[in-house]
Design a protein with these regions (language model features):
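N-terminal secretory/targeting leader peptides
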Residues: 2-151, 174-382
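A gly/proline- and charged-residue-enriched helix-loop-helix capping module
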Residues: 150-161, 165
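Short beta-strand or tight-loop elements
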Residues: 171
C-alpha cells in the first residue's frame, strides 16, 4: 500500500472512531457508506447535519437491519434510502437512527423487538411474520410467487391487503413495504456434482434447508435429500460436504461470503428471497396524521427504488461470484416447466398447505389470481 493510501486509511479510521466515540454512530455509518470517511470536511458536515436533524425532529425512529451499510450494492435492502426518504417526507419531524449489520439482532429477534416496541422499525424476512399470519407462508409454496414479478404483484394486491395485512396488524405490526430481492437459486458447492439443470441432477444431493416444512417437502419432491442446517452453520457445512447445495438468492450468497466455496448456480425461480420493513403499529398509530402520511409515502418511494435496484444488484453479485469461478445457468421455459411439474404448487401434495395457510381454497384462488395479475409495479426477473 503506498503512502497516500495509508494516509487515507488512517484518516478514515480516525474519523470513524471520532464520530462513533462522540455518540454519532449513525453519522459514522452514513459517511462510511458514502466512502467519505477520509475527508475531515465531509465527516464534520455529516456529523453536524445528523446532529441538527436529530435535535430538530419531534420523533425518533430506530431502524434495525441485519445488513451492513453498503450491502445494497448486491442485496437491495435500501436502508440508507429509507432513512433519507422518511426524514425528508416527514419534513424533518422524524429522525431515523440506523442500527445496521445485526447490531440489535436479525430475523425473528428483530421482528420480536418491533412487536414489543423496543424498536420502531426493522427489516426481516417475510417468513418471520408467519407465526402471526400463517397466510404469509404461502410465499414458500414453489412457483406460487417465485418470480420477482409474481411476488411484487401479490404483496401489492388488494387481495393481500385484505387477507394478510389485517392479521399482521392484529399482532401489533404495520408492514411499511415489502422488499424484492430476487428468487432463491440452486447453488452447488465446489467439489459437488456439477451444474443442476433438471430435477434429476439433484438425485442424492444433500440440500441445505431451513426449518420450513414446505421447503423441505419441495426439495424432496424434486429429488434432493433435504438436510436441515442452521443458517450460521451453513458455510462450514458446505465447505465440509455435510451439505452439497443451498438456496439463498445470488445477492445473499455474495453478502454472506459464499463466493469461494461454490461452483454452479442455477436460476430455478421457485421461491422468492422476500424481506419486509415492519413498524410497531401502536407507535405508528400514535403519530400525527401528516407524519403517518409522510412515512407511508417514504415507504412507497423506497419501494420504487428497491425494484429499480434489483437487476443492478444481481449483476454486481454475479460479477463478483464469476470472478471466483462460479458458473451461472438460466433455464428455458421448457426447462422451468420440468421443475414446476415435479414440485410446483399445482400438485395435490400442496393442497393441505393451501387450506391450512390461506384458510380455504377460495381464498387461495384469490391470492393465486393476484400473483398472476400484473399490478402497477414492474420488476426485472432473473
Amino acid at each position: 500500500m503506498d503512502k497516500t493510501k495509508l494516509e487515507l486509511a488512517s484518516a478514515s479510521r480516525r474519523n470513524f472512531l471520532k464520530l462513533a466515540g462522540t455518540g454519532s454512530f449513525t453519522a459514522a455509518m452514513v459517511v462510511g457508506a458514502g466512502g467519505m470517511l477520509w475527508s475531515d470536511a465531509a465527516v464534520a458536515q455529516t456529523a453536524n447535519e445528523e446532529r441538527d436533524r436529530a435535535a430538530a425532529a419531534e420523533h425518533t425512529m430506530t431502524l434495525a437491519t441485519a445488513y451492513v451499510l453498503g450491502a445494497s450494492r448486491s442485496y437491495p435492502i435500501m436502508q440508507l434510502d429509507l432513512k433519507e426518504n422518511i426524514q425528508n417526507a416527514t419534513n424533518g419531524k422524524v429522525y431515523v437512527k440506523l442500527a445496521p449489520g445485526g447490531q440489535l439482532g436479525a430475523g425473528g429477534a428483530l421482528a420480536q423487538a418491533v412487536q414489543g416496541g423496543t424498536i420502531q422499525c426493522a427489516q426481516h424476512s417475510l417468513s418471520n411474520f408467519a407465526p402471526f399470519a400463517s397466510t404469509v407462508d404461502l410465499i414458500n409454496m414453489p412457483y406460487f410467487c417465485g418470480s420477482n414479478q409474481r411476488f411484487t404483484n401479490l404483496v401489492n394486491s388488494d387481495a393481500w391487503k385484505q387477507e394478510v395485512d389485517p392479521k399482521i396488524e392484529a399482532s401489533g405490526f404495520k408492514a411499511l413495504f415489502y422488499i424484492n430481492i430476487d428468487p432463491r437459486v440452486v447453488a452447488v458447492r465446489k467439489g459437488g456434482k456439477g451444474a443442476v439443470i433438471t430435477p434429476s441432477d439433484l438425485s442424492g444431493v444433500k440440500f441445505r434447508v431451513p426449518g420450513s416444512a414446505m421447503l423441505q417437502q419441495y426439495y424432496r419432491m424434486v429429488g434432493a435429500n433435504p438436510t436441515p442446517v442452521a443458517w450460521g452453520e451453513t458455510p462450514s457445512a458446505i465447505k465440509q460436504g455435510v451439505a452439497d447445495a443451498l438456496d439463498p438468492s445470488v445477492g445473499a450468497l455474495f453478502v454472506f461470503g459464499f463466493k469461494d466455496i461454490l461452483s454452479h448456480v442455477t436460476f430455478t425461480q421457485a421461491v422468492p428471497d422476500s424481506q419486509v420493513y415492519s413498524m410497531n403499529l401502536e407507535w405508528f398509530n400514535g403519530l400525527p396524521a401528516d407524519v403517518q402520511e409522510g412515512i407511508e409515502f417514504a415507504g412507497e418511494m423506497t419501494s420504487h427504488q428497491n425494484l429499480a435496484k434489483v437487476p443492478s444488484a444481481r449483476a454486481y453479485a454475479m460479477s463478483e461470484l464469476r470472478k471466483a469461478g462460479v458458473e451461472f445457468h438460466s433455464l428455458t421455459d421448457d426447462q422451468l416447466a420440468v421443475w414446476k411439474d415435479a414440485g410446483g404448487y399445482q400438485r395435490s401434495e400442496w393442497d393441505s398447505f393451501k387450506v391450512e395457510l390461506a384458510g380455504s381454497m377460495d381464498t387461495f384462488a384469490k391470492l393465486e389470481e393476484a400473483a398472476g395479475t400484473q399490478g402497477r409495479y414492474y420488476v426485472h426477473d432473473a
